[in-house]
């Protein structure tokens, strides 16, 4: 009889243990970020998300091993937080908002500035990369964009702009037809 009373207690303890010992989904999200080339945009910068999906399609056609995906943040604050802490390697913003991010002004005034390197322009949009984004990856990404340029409305090399900008070194190498850098 005593064993019959212990069974419900054991089940309750086992249930509590399973709840607290279960794996967090965050580990899977980190693995997802490592397996896919994520291009972040934000709801607050309306044209960025639809264009990021087009960009992802072109990248995946030209460079399938990148397994590129569009990612969308809800707010500019979230964008700045994820990008400035190296959680997202690439960011697509309108030129106005990209300048604001780099200077910590405008919509990013209360969040602060973030350092970034230019990969490519698409009309009023700019693709930015983390300064720590490997030169080899920037070279591969730029090369994929160049090969898929006909499918990317308004794609413009950063070398064609008249303003002085901070272009990613790997992008410069690809645009100058230099060989792919080592990792």
PLM regions: where:
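Immediate post-signal peptide segment of exported/extracytoplasmic ligand-binding proteins
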Residues: 25-39, 171-183
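Short, well-ordered beta-strand elements
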Residues: 33-48, 68-71
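A bilobed periplasmic-binding-protein/Venus flytrap-type ligand-binding module shared by bacterial periplasmic
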Residues: 41, 119-137
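Short, polar/charged alpha-helical segment
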Residues: 48-64
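Short helices/loops that flank or line small-molecule/ion binding pockets
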Residues: 53, 76-91
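Short helix-initiation/N-cap motifs at beta->coil->alpha
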Residues: 64-81, 162
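A ligand-binding cleft/hinge motif common to bilobed small-molecule-binding domains
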Residues: 88-110
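An extracytoplasmic/periplasmic, membrane-proximal ligand-sensing/linker region
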Residues: 151-183
């Amino acid at each position: 009889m005593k064993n019959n009373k212990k069974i419900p207690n054991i089940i309750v303890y086992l249930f509590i243990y399973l709840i607290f010992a279960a794996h967090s989904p965050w580990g899977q999200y980190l693995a997802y970020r490592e397996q896919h080339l994520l291009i972040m945009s934000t709801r607050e910068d309306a044209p960025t998300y639809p264009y990021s999906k087009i960009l992802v399609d072109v990248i995946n056609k030209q460079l399938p091993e990148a397994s590129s995906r569009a990612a969308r943040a809800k707010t500019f604050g979230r964008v700045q937080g994820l990008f400035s802490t190296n959680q997202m390697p690439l960011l697509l913003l309108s030129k106005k908002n990209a300048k604001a991010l780099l200077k910590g002004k405008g919509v990013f005034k209360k969040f602060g500035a973030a350092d970034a390197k230019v990969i490519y322009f698409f009309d009023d949009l700019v693709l930015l990369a983390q300064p720590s984004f490997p030169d080899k990856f920037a070279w591969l990404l730029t090369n994929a964009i160049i090969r898929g340029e006909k499918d990317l409305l308004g794609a413009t090399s950063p070398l064609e702009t008249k303003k002085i900008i901070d272009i990613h070194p790997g992008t410069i190498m690809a645009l100058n037809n230099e060989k792919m850098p080592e990792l």
